[in-house]
Amino acid sequence: MTIYNFSAGPAVLPKDVLQQVQAELVDWHGSGMSVMEMSHRGKEFMGIAAEAEADLRELMAIPANYKVLFLQGGASSQFAMVPMNLLRGKASADYLNTGEWSKKAIKEAKKYAAVNVVASSEDRNFSYAPTQDRWKLDPNAAYVHYTPNETIGGVEIFWTPEAGDVPIAADMSSTILSRPIDVSKYGVIYAGAQKNIGPAGLTIVIVREDLMGETVAGTPTMFDYKIHADNESMYNTPATFAMYTAGLVFKWLKARGGLAGMEKINREKAALLYEALDATDFYASPVAKDNRSLMNVPFTLKDAALDEAFLKGAKERGLLQLKGHRSVGGMRASIYNAMPTEGVKALVDYLHAFEKNHG
């Protein structure tokens, strides 16, 4: 039986990548060492790190005036690092509130700045994203922060906000590398790796050079982007094995047509699943159609009393980790880059079969 893992994160990794990791685990390229054993300053690992950065730059077409940082601490640490680095003498920042992760970012930013919530979708249980004509931007804000894809709620924003000269900061943890974006429109992009990049423990930050070097008073050394940039992400020991695995994922993506190729596949996968959910009233998708995520698909059963039976039957078919987040309930299928189309088709087949037996 083929197993398909729909976990929101840590999440499915490409089978090809896992097999390469397995083959190289004990002896990387004849070095006599596992990547886990290498000095992060040795020539072997320095080469791995440089190649990973070069491949990510190529995949995302990252301009030369942006630094790529391989950090730790997850997006949750970035909720503090963004204001610490981007306030740059200003007192306030703009935040869009579209779900649980937006709320966490807002809560943390309030420790360092006056937060202006430009718009919120909490009025409809975070089931949509407010269009920009509804935003109340502050021209004096240090930056504008938003979450393009809310992992829990499955709400995605497919356009990039316009804020004039005010830098845009984006938590792309669950959407990065799923489709092309114009990096030059952002001041800072950050993402925990454990959803669409690689193993947990790695956080990728892409930051425009002119936004580094002026931190708020009392900023810890480890929270200063410029320190990490000046030390090529090796101020402290980085998450070496996670960086190596991420580098293999970058090569896997390049071999599949890059981000344009992945977007085509991801849209096809998402369409299959949403069409199945929309075809019946036995299931429901709570998200407005314009904001339905390509990566995280929450859905509910008409009768919540059937939830446990649904999950049990799914597990018996090898469909794992479909339980929704504890804060919202229901189901959630995360269909990241590494989820093959066959996995989505298997889930759709199960949706039909379960309804036939219980509808």
UniProtKB/Swiss-Prot annotation:
InterPro entries: Aminotrans_V_dom, Aminotrans_V_PyrdxlP_BS, Pser_aminoTfrase, PyrdxlP-dep_Trfase, PyrdxlP-dep_Trfase_major, PyrdxlP-dep_Trfase_small
Cofactor: pyridoxal 5'-phosphate
GO function terms (MF aspect): O-phospho-L-serine:2-oxoglutarate aminotransferase activity; pyridoxal phosphate binding
Biological processes per GO annotation: L-serine biosynthetic process; pyridoxine biosynthetic process
Disulfide bonds: none
Binding site for L-glutamate: 41
Entry keyword Transferase: yes
Protein EC: 2.6.1.52
Pathway where it operates: Amino-acid biosynthesis; L-serine biosynthesis; L-serine from 3-phospho-D-glycerate: step 2/3; Cofactor biosynthesis; pyridoxine 5'-phosphate biosynthesis; pyridoxine 5'-phosphate from D-erythrose 4-phosphate: step 3/5
Reactions that this protein is recorded to catalyse: O-phospho-L-serine + 2-oxoglutarate = 3-phosphooxypyruvate + L-glutamate; 4-(phosphooxy)-L-threonine + 2-oxoglutarate = (R)-3-hydroxy-2-oxo-4-phosphooxybutanoate + L-glutamate
CDD domains per UniProt: PSAT_like
Keywords of this entry: Amino-acid biosynthesis, Aminotransferase, Cytoplasm, Pyridoxal phosphate, Pyridoxine biosynthesis, Serine biosynthesis, Transferase
Description of how the protein assembles with itself and partners: Homodimer.
Name this protein carries in UniProt: Phosphoserine aminotransferase
